[in-house]
């Protein structure tokens, strides 16, 4: 990792949790619109939809092409291997099993501790890089009920990270109180229809990692919970645009 990037970012710089999905791509555009220096971080934890990691480079390149200022602000990309997370998780995201709901109402796509681990490692990297702001795509408005996506969870973790690292990190969750339709609209607000098309074409959301089927909202199996949320959100976004 080049150390000079940390100096360029300073405390005004940001680190974005960037999976290659719709939400993280929108969050990256949001961060590029606000911070003078932005770095990205992806995680390989043995997820079935590992194809999302392959989309990250194309999304980063596409975002820099949309706005010269974004290109100047976009810094290095980092990837961390968290194989242990996948090894201890018996979920439909890390095992070849059918997606279903458990008795507690949570889908078996929930990876316990995933966002807690992601944000903790992100803070450790931000500490080294000299970056104060950490941006994630967590949301509790239009989501699958994951407890580590809740606003209370993120606020509590921010306190713990700052106490444990003696820093003043700020955890930003720009999608926390908006639904998928509004997330599509936010992308248009940030980068126009060109950004919406970039997210449609290059981002990946499908839990099964399906890239063979192209829909108006992007690629995916079309039936898993992630595809369902994305498709319905895109439909509502288009309907609102037409009004």
From Swiss-Prot:
CDD domains noted in UniProt: QueC-like
Annotated GO biological process: queuosine biosynthetic process
Keyword Glycosyltransferase carried by entry: no
Superkingdom of source: Bacteria
EC number from the UniProt entry: 6.3.4.20
Cofactor: Zn(2+)
Pathway: Purine metabolism; 7-cyano-7-deazaguanine biosynthesis
Keywords: ATP-binding, Ligase, Metal-binding, Nucleotide-binding, Queuosine biosynthesis, Zinc
InterPro entries xrefs: QueC, Rossmann-like_a/b/a_fold
Family named by the database record: Belongs to the QueC family.
Name of the featured protein: 7-cyano-7-deazaguanine synthase
Positions that bind ATP: 18-28
Reaction catalyzed: 7-carboxy-7-deazaguanine + NH4(+) + ATP = 7-cyano-7-deazaguanine + ADP + phosphate + H2O + H(+)
Organism: Methylorubrum extorquens (strain CM4 / NCIMB 13688) (Methylobacterium extorquens)
Record flagged with keyword Ligase: yes
GO molecular function: ATP binding; ligase activity, forming carbon-nitrogen bonds; zinc ion binding
Ranges annotated as spanning the membrane: none
Binding site for Zn(2+): 206, 221, 224, 227
Enzyme superclass (EC): ligase
A Pfam family recorded for this sequence: QueC
Cofactor-binding details, from the entry: Binds 1 zinc ion per subunit.
Task performed by this protein: Catalyzes the ATP-dependent conversion of 7-carboxy-7-deazaguanine (CDG) to 7-cyano-7-deazaguanine (preQ(0)).
């Amino acid at each position: 990792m080049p150390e000079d990037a940390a100096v360029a970012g300073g405390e005004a710089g940001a680190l974005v949790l960037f999976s290659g999905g719709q939400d993280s791509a929108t969050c990256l555009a949001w961060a590029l619109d606000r911070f003078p220096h932005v770095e990205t971080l992806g995680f390989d934890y043995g997820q079935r939809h590992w194809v999302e990691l392959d989309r990250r480079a194309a999304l980063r390149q596409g975002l820099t092409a949309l706005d010269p200022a974004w290109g100047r602000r976009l810094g290095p990309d980092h990837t961390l291997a968290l194989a242990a997370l996948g090894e201890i998780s018996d979920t439909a995201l890390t095992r070849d099993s059918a997606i279903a709901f458990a008795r507690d109402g949570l889908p078996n796509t929930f990876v316990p501790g995933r966002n807690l681990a992601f944000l903790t490692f992100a803070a450790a990297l931000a500490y080294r890089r000299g970056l104060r702001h950490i941006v994630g795509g967590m949301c509790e408005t239009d989501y699958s009920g994951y407890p580590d996506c809740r606003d209370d969870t993120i606020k509590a973790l921010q306190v713990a990270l700052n106490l444990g690292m003696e820093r003043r990190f700020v955890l930003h969750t720009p999608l926390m109180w908006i639904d998928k339709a509004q997330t599509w609209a936010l992308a248009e607000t940030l980068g126009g229809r060109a950004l919406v098309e970039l997210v449609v074409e290059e981002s990946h959301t499908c839990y099964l990692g399906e890239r063979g089927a192209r829909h108006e909202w992007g690629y995916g199996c079309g039936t898993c919970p992630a595809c369902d949320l994305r498709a319905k959100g895109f439909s509502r976004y288009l309907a609102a645009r037409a009004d």
